[in-house]
Amino acid sequence: MRHASVDDIPVLAHHRVAMFRDMGQLAPELKDALQRATASYLDDALPRGEYLAWIAEDSGKPPTAIGGAGVQLRPILPRPRTAADLELGPEAIVLNVYVEPAWRRRGVAETLMRTVLDALASRGIQRIVLHASDAGRRLYERLGFVLTNEMRLGR
């Protein structure tokens, strides 16, 4: 497991495309456009620290990326977390948790997520959200994520 750099943008973009493809949410004709748009976003966001990413690799020589995960950081207004405590920003949005099919069901996603959560805790980030796929929901629940009342405008 290692922290990703701008040199890893092609792998990170590939994982994002593969994730949406595997969930059945990507029309084949959008694959190249999503790959380019993702790479363009990461080219700006990674150096600015607005997006953090990790790569899981096999033990080959040279190692091959077998999975990855990312976090988009966004500022939030301070708000009460409890009656006696404030929740300060930024908010971390976990994105693009992806494991290559041949490596699934071997604990790679859990290791990625524990790495992400440890890194965010070390930065003092209190609010962590994600959108769970059906395949990932049990893992996220085991890690302590709970359903919320968040809603989205359906346009």
What are these regions (language model features)?
Residues 81-101, 153:
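Conserved acetyl-CoA binding element of GNAT-fold acetyltransferases
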Residues 55, 63-73, 93, 98:
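Conserved beta-strand in the GNAT
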Residues 76-82, 129-135, 141, 146-155:
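Conserved catalytic-core motifs of GNAT/GCN5-like acyltransferases
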Residues 113, 120-132:
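Conserved GNAT acetyl-CoA-binding A-motif
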Residues 1-14, 25:
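A short beta-loop-alpha structural element at the N-terminal edge
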Residues 31-58, 76:
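Active-site rim helix/loop that mediates acceptor-substrate recognition in acyltransferases
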Residues 103-115:
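Conserved acetyl-CoA pyrophosphate-binding loop and the N-cap/start of the following alpha-helix
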